[in-house]
Amino acid sequence: MRLWLRGLVYQARRSSWGVFRIHTQPPPPPIPEVVATWEAISLGKRPVPEYFNFAHDVLDVWSQLEKTGHRPPNPAFWWVNGSGTEVKWTFEELGKQSRKAANILEGACGLKPGDRLMLVLPRLPEWWLTIVACMRTGVVMIPGISQLTQKDLKYRLQAARVKSIITSDALAPHVDAISADCPSLQSRLLVSDTSRPGWINFRELLRVASPEHNCLRTRSGDSMAIYFTSGTTGTPKMVEHSQCSYGLGFVASGRRLMALTESDIFWNTTDTGWVKAAWTLFSAWANGACVFVHELPQVDAQTILNTLCRFPITTICCVPTLFRLLVQEDLTRYKFQCLRHCLAGGEALNSDVRDKWKNQTGLEIHEGYGQSETVLICGNFRGSTIKSGSMGKASPPYDVQIVDEEGNVLPPGKEGNIAIRIKPTRPFCLFNCYLDNPEKTAASEQGDFYITGDRAHMDEDGYFWFVGRNDDVINSSSYRIGPVEVESALAEHPAVLESAVVSSPDPIRGEVVKAFIVLSPAYVSHDPEALTRELQEHVKTVTAPYKYPRKVAFISELPKTVSGKILRSKLRNQEWGR
């Protein structure tokens, strides 16, 4: 494996080195060997390699090329905060630090291949180090957003039988409070400049850990990552990905959608707990690009725009919600010296936002669409015609179709389920399964297809046009929110007799959580405004704050089927004027 990737990187280095030195558009770089190999795998001309490890077969090769002067002097990782502190690592330094982190996981934490480590950290350099350390050791990483509540943490630690967790001072007390209920949890890593009883201080050990470590030889199909994803019923599901699905699957998105080369500096503003953070890591580093990170304790438009002016960022990826905030500023006041490519994903982007951004910056916004279960499904690739409002065309190796409820392919113009063909050959860059949930895994397949759960139609030119979810999941500012999670939180308040939670349109967030609530008799006469605020604050204390209902309506009864099931679809259609 290392031989063909070595060839890929030597070829990739011949691309546009002078991106900061020339002002004309450089010629398209040659397709590197990794993309050629990936395409051969997707076409069945070359089998998926038996062994693959992204840290060993990609990152360490770039490190060797740096030593021989065959890569531009860009950092591989560049972190900044609002106080002027910066951290820069070359691929060689990234390798050294991640090997030290790997020794901590194996030594102080006692983790073995296949053990599971939960990562709940804000945008700190240690998050990226630990991700690479997991690859080197065969430890399965489980990223989580930093807004998780004590209840959320407990469920995830128990469901995934997590052996160790790495987090910061903010969440450590929550972990302490529930650790007795999580028997699988054997060690706790703290990223902090201070110590805490019962915790292993990651930074202290990193300073003295050995930089020598032998990377585990992992099989392509070995488990590499687990992501919790919200659904319409019950608790979040565990999506398992392999070394190959992410390690090789994101190479193409890095080239085709993000247009990255080893001269680029790529900034994705997403939270570390979301799958898009992994998109950045694999897409950028597979193509030798630099991953840029701003700590962003609070996301605001001015910080984003000033950062784009101050640093030589060439490519940025934001959720549409953030672009909606950015275009409300006077963008002509900001001069982006190096920015040349803009990306959006996580939800549909409004055409007016794209137009405003282009009119003031001269830059297109290229949308990409994917899921926790997949890599890039379709996108508006660089160099292709953008149809405003479309998600673009299918991304190989996926054969993407629009199908009906029986799995039959529909003609252009017909609305149906977005589906990926999995027979006769399942794409290597699709998730393995929903862990411990064979029923959910089976239900996601219909005939020859994996059903995404999203609806769209495809036009005559092969462009996909998003319609919406065919279930009740709410996508607010790219946060996926299951209605049952919010309804369960509301049910813990004595004022709530029953509730139904649906999406409601919002000009900034795209959609927000709206709760229709039937009050208990004792609360019917309460002041509705005060009760709304009380219920909103209650939800924030029970589950992650981003899930709270921004809109609340008190009604006498909920619409239901004859069997008593709540008709969320009727309420949702009412909100959206359907």
UniProtKB/Swiss-Prot annotation:
Record Pfam families: AMP-binding (PF00501), AMP-binding_C (PF13193)
Top-level division of the source organism's lineage: Eukaryota
SUPFAM superfamilies per UniProt: Acetyl-CoA synthetase-like (SSF56801)
Entry keyword annotation includes 4Fe-4S: no
The organism of origin for this protein: Rattus norvegicus
Family stated for the protein in its record: Belongs to the ATP-dependent AMP-binding enzyme family.
Listed name of the protein: Acyl-coenzyme A synthetase ACSM5, mitochondrial
PROSITE patterns: AMP_BINDING (PS00455)
Record function comment: Catalyzes the activation of fatty acids by CoA to produce an acyl-CoA, the first step in fatty acid metabolism.
One of the record's GO cellular component terms: mitochondrial matrix
